[in-house]
Design a protein with these regions (language model features):
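A structural boundary/capping signal
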Residues: 3-171
C-alpha cells in the first residue's frame, strides 16, 4: 500500500497493517496476523472461523502429547497431525498442491483456503505450521529463499532446524 501524506493513512487496510506493526514481535499472534493480512486480499474470509479452526487443531495436537513434552515431541506431534493419516486427523492429511506448484493462484496462499482444501504451497504450508507451532509453545520463524518459505524451529538445546513443510515437515 502506497501511503502519502493525507492520502489514505486512515484507510482500514492501512490501519490494520499499522496495528500489526505496532505489536512487539514476541507478542504477535502469528495466526491472527496472517489472517488479518489474508483478509486484505480476500475480505470474505471469516477470521473468527479460521482462527477457531486453528485453535481447534492446536488443541487436538496438544492432546497427542504430555504436558511436559519436549520441543521434539511437540514438533513430531505437529508433523504427524498435518502429514500422516490417522484417527487424530480423520485420515485427512495436508499436502502440497501440485496443480499450482509455483503458487501463482493467490487464494492458495491464504490460510482459510488451505484449511478448507488441505492443499497448500510454500506460503500456506509453512505459515499454518508456524501458527500451530506458536500455539504449542514452540519457538519458530519463517525463513525465505527465492520463491520459497520454510520454517526455522529451535529445539530445547537452542539449535535451529530447517523444517520443510512442503515435503512432509521433515528437517
Amino acid at each position: 500500500f502506497a501511503v502519502t501524506a493525507g492520502s489514505g493513512a486512515s484507510h482500514p487496510h492501512v490501519q490494520a497493517v499499522q496495528q500489526l506493526l505496532s505489536i512487539p514481535e514476541p507478542d504477535v499472534d502469528f495466526a491472527a496476523a496472517k489472517v488479518t493480512i489474508d483478509r486484505l486480499i480476500d475480505p470474505h474470509i471469516d477470521a473468527e472461523v479460521t482462527l477457531r479452526r486453528i485453535d481447534e487443531i492446536a488443541a487436538e495436537i496438544r492432546a497427542l502429547v504430555t504436558f511436559r513434552s519436549t520441543t521434539q515431541q511437540r514438533a513430531a506431534a505437529l508433523r504427524s497431525y498435518l502429514y500422516d493419516a490417522g484417527p487424530w486427523n480423520k485420515g485427512q492429511t495436508f499436502s502440497y498442491d501440485f496443480n499450482d506448484p509455483l503458487g501463482r493462484h493467490l487464494p492458495n496462499k491464504l490460510l482459510a483456503n488451505y484449511l478448507r482444501t488441505r492443499k497448500g504451497n510454500c506460503v500456506s504450508m509453512p505459515f499454518l505450521y508456524i501458527a500451530l507451532a506458536q500455539k504449542l509453545g514452540l519457538t519458530v520463524g519463517a525463513a525465505t529463499s527465492p520463491r520459497h518459505v520454510f520454517v526455522k524451529l529451535r529445539d530445547d538445546h537452542g539449535t535451529w532446524h530447517n523444517i520443510e513443510t512442503v515435503s512432509g515437515g521433515w528437517p
